[in-house]
C-alpha cells in the first residue's frame, strides 16, 4: 500500500544511500580495486541483491521505487512489471505488488521458440511494461531486456532501478536513443555524500573514490593491472 505522502526525490536519495550503507551493500577498496564485468578496475562496488535479506529496508526502498515511478511516469502508466533475470526478479515482484499489477520476468537467453521465448509469465501485445532491475552502470544491459519485451508486441519506454552509477555520461543517451527513460533512487554521488556525513570510511578512501567518480576512465587507466 503506497502512503498518501512521501519524501522528496532528494530525501529519497539520501535515505536510500543511508540504507545501502547500513546493510553493507557499499564496498570501497582503493588498495585492491574490484574488477568490473568489463575487466576494468573500480575502487567501488555495490551489491543491491543483499536487500532481499533485510525486510524493513527492502520494503521501504520498494515503496520509494513505486512512488518514484508514479511521480515521474504517472499513476496509470503501466500494465505489467517485468524483472530482468536474475537480480531484477525479486524487486519486480515487490513493485508489482505495490502497484497492483501483473509481474513477469525476462530471461537473458531464450527458452524455446517464438516471440515470447524470453518472457516468463503472461505478457500481451499492447501492454505498457515497466522494466525493473537492481542497478545500471552504462545502461547497455537494459537494452537486451527492452528488446525482448518489445518483441512480444508490448511497449517498454521506462526502466526503474534502485541504484544508478551516474558516472558515465553516455548512459542516459544510450537509453534515450532506445526510447527508454531511466528512474532511480540514488547514485554514487548520494552514497559518497552520506558516507562522508557518517564518516563510514576513511577520508583518504573517500577522496580516492571521488577521484574515480569524477573521471572513471582516467582512474581505471592509472590503476589498470599490467
Swiss-Prot record:
Cofactor(s) demanded: Mg(2+)
EC number(s) reported in the record: 2.4.2.10
Short name of one Pfam family: Pribosyltran
Binding site for 5-phospho-alpha-D-ribose 1-diphosphate: 107-108, 111, 133-141
An individual GO BP term: 'de novo' UMP biosynthetic process
GO molecular-function terms, A-Z: magnesium ion binding; orotate phosphoribosyltransferase activity
Catalysed reaction equations from the record: orotidine 5'-phosphate + diphosphate = orotate + 5-phospho-alpha-D-ribose 1-diphosphate
InterPro entries: OPRT, PRibTrfase_dom, PRTase-like
PANTHER family: OROTATE PHOSPHORIBOSYLTRANSFERASE (PTHR19278), URIDINE 5'-MONOPHOSPHATE SYNTHASE (PTHR19278:SF9)
Family: Belongs to the purine/pyrimidine phosphoribosyltransferase family. PyrE subfamily.
Subunit-level organization: Homodimer.
Designated name of the protein: Orotate phosphoribosyltransferase
Native source species: Ruegeria sp. (strain TM1040) (Silicibacter sp.)
Amino acid at each position: 500500500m503506497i502512503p498518501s505522502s512521501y519524501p522528496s526525490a532528494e530525501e529519497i536519495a539520501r535515505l536510500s544511500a543511508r540504507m545501502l550503507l547500513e546493510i553493507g551493500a557499499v564496498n570501497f577498496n582503493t588498495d585492491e580495486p574490484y574488477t568490473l564485468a568489463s575487466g576494468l578496475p573500480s575502487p567501488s562496488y555495490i551489491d543491491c541483491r543483499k536487500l532481499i535479506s533485510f525486510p524493513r529496508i527492502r520494503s521501504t526502498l520498494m515503496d520509494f521505487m513505486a512512488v518514484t515511478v508514479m511521480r515521474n511516469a504517472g499513476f496509470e502508466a503501466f500494465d505489467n512489471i517485468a524483472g530482468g533475470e536474475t537480480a531484477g526478479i525479486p524487486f519486480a515482484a515487490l513493485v508489482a505488488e505495490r502497484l497492483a499489477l501483473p509481474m513477469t520476468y525476462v530471461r537473458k537467453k531464450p527458452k524455446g521458440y517464438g516471440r515470447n521465448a524470453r518472457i516468463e509469465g503472461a505478457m500481451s501485445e499492447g501492454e505498457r511494461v515497466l522494466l525493473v532491475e537492481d542497478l545500471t552502470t552504462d545502461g547497455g544491459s537494459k537494452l537486451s531486456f527492452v528488446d525482448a519485451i518489445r518483441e512480444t508486441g508490448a511497449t517498454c519506454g521506462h526502466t526503474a532501478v534502485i541504484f544508478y552509477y551516474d558516472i558515465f555520461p553516455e548512459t542516459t543517451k544510450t537509453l534515450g536513443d532506445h526510447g527508454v527513460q531511466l528512474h532511480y533512487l540514488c547514485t554514487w554521488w548520494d552514497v559518497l555524500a552520506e558516507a562522508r556525513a557518517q564518516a563510514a570510511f576513511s577520508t583518504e578512501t573517500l577522496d580516492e573514490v571521488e577521484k574515480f567518480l569524477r573521471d572513471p576512465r582516467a582512474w581505471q587507466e592509472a590503476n589498470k593491472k599490467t
